[in-house]
């Protein structure tokens, strides 16, 4: 990992640390009360990991804004990145098996 990439990951890692602390310390006290799948904290974790700091935070804020009695909830997965959208058809054809690449 380059130093520049490492520096870009610092805000993501700080946010992930806050999310993990919430999941370990606060969430068990509240119980399972999220009206979405995945839960809002897991959604935020996935969004930050796949979309980076700015877009991950934006997606997380939008999701938390929907989490209330005014929204029915349900399944709400993190949107795919552009790269995931491009690679998905090839993964379906390949079946996700990369054994043909090994010697």
From Swiss-Prot:
One Pfam family per UniProt: YidD
Compartment(s) of residence: Cell inner membrane
Chief subcellular location: membrane
Xref: InterPro entries: Membr_insert_effic_factor_YidD
Domain of life assignment: Bacteria
Cellular component per GO, a single term: plasma membrane
Keywords: Cell inner membrane, Cell membrane, Membrane
Entry membrane topology: Peripheral membrane protein
Family (UniProt): Belongs to the UPF0161 family.
PANTHER family linked: MEMBRANE PROTEIN INSERTION EFFICIENCY FACTOR-RELATED
Function comment: Could be involved in insertion of integral membrane proteins into the membrane.
Name of the protein: Putative membrane protein insertion efficiency factor
Organism of this sequence: Chlamydia pneumoniae
């Amino acid at each position: 990992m380059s130093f520049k990439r490492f520096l870009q990951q610092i805000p993501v890692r700080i946010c992930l640390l806050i999310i993990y602390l919430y999941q370990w310390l606060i969430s068990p006290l509240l119980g399972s009360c999220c009206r979405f799948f995945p839960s809002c904290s897991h959604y935020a974790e996935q969004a930050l990991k796949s979309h980076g700091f700015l877009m991950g935070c934006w997606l997380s804020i939008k999701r938390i804004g929907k989490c209330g009695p005014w929204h029915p909830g349900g399944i709400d997965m993190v949107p795919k990145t552009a790269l995931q959208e491009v690679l998905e058809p090839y993964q379906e054809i390949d079946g996700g098996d990369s054994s043909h690449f090994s010697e």
